[in-house]
């Protein structure tokens, strides 16, 4: 009888992360992962993968390449990033990345009521943020833009 060789793929590598969460054949894994993060606050039933490379309006603008970029069935956008190396300004980078799907929602040259679909940036970090704003005892942090007095988006 032939022995089955076991193979593992590391989610901490760019290849492994994109292979598991960024391919249509594994879409169910991404949906399950997103739903586990939302913990019932929202239910993701389906996603469509989008082009992860974004460039600015002119060639001199900064570009962004997301690990995984997709759209939910209600028009919400999901950016999912795996970051191994420490980056001092990762919060700023995450906010910068979020501007691309926000800007995509603004049609050029037509009337627009400025209604925006939700944009979620999910970052799996293999390092500590080392900031006072984050509880060092927790491994998961939920951060959002909100009205401070009511803690409401």
Which ranges hold each PLM region?
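Elongated, amphipathic alpha-helical interaction scaffolds
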Residues: 1-152
């Amino acid at each position: 009888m032939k022995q089955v060789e076991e193979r593992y793929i590391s989610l901490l590598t760019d290849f492994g992360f994109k292979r598991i969460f960024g391919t249509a054949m594994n879409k169910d894994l991404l949906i399950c992962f997103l739903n586990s993060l939302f913990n019932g606050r929202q239910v993701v039933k389906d996603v469509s993968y989008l082009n992860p490379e974004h460039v600015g309006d002119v060639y001199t603008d900064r570009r962004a390449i997301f690990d995984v970029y997709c759209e939910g069935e209600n028009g919400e956008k999901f950016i999912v990033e795996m970051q191994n190396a420490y980056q001092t300004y990762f919060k700023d980078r995450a906010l910068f990345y979020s501007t691309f799907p926000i800007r995509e929602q603004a049609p050029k040259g037509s009337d627009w009521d400025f209604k925006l679909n939700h944009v979620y940036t999910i970052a799996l970090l293999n390092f500590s943020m080392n900031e006072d704003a984050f509880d060092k005892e927790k491994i998961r942090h939920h951060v959002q833009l909100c009205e401070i007095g009511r803690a409401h988006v």
